[in-house]
């Protein structure tokens, strides 16, 4: 899970991050597993820039356009450290709870036995954000 202070801690309705984290924690409490929490706030543009991106979204830019307006790629995150962490714990196969195909493709030496989708209903504040993630970033929503 990539850090999202506004969603994870403050309950922002602009994204589904806090609900995704809660969904993952509930499933892990029932079935076992672990969360790897990555310090990549705002798709790795940082909290200050994320707040500026939110302001641009309020002006009508979508989440990708807002990042581009600030001089960033649509997604600045990387996931290579996940493989290192899993290897440290001698984990070579996983069931991955994600909607993000980029997370699956970065795990070169880890066998993904199964991908479990994270099903979170949209709300009036994040419906366009989720649509952009699906249509422009390839998220499996």
From Swiss-Prot:
Catalyzes the conversion of GTP to 2,5-diamino-6-ribosylamino-4(3H)-pyrimidinone 5'-phosphate (DARP), formate and pyrophosphate. It comes from Sulfurospirillum multivorans. This is GTP cyclohydrolase-2. It catalyses: GTP + 4 H2O = 2,5-diamino-6-hydroxy-4-(5-phosphoribosylamino)-pyrimidine + formate + 2 phosphate + 3 H(+). One of its GO terms (cellular component) is cytosol. The lineage of its organism: Bacteria, Pseudomonadati, Campylobacterota, Epsilonproteobacteria, Campylobacterales. The active site is at 75 (proton acceptor), 77 (nucleophile). Its cofactor is Zn(2+). Belongs to the GTP cyclohydrolase II family. Keywords: GTP-binding, Hydrolase, Metal-binding, Nucleotide-binding, Riboflavin biosynthesis, Zinc.
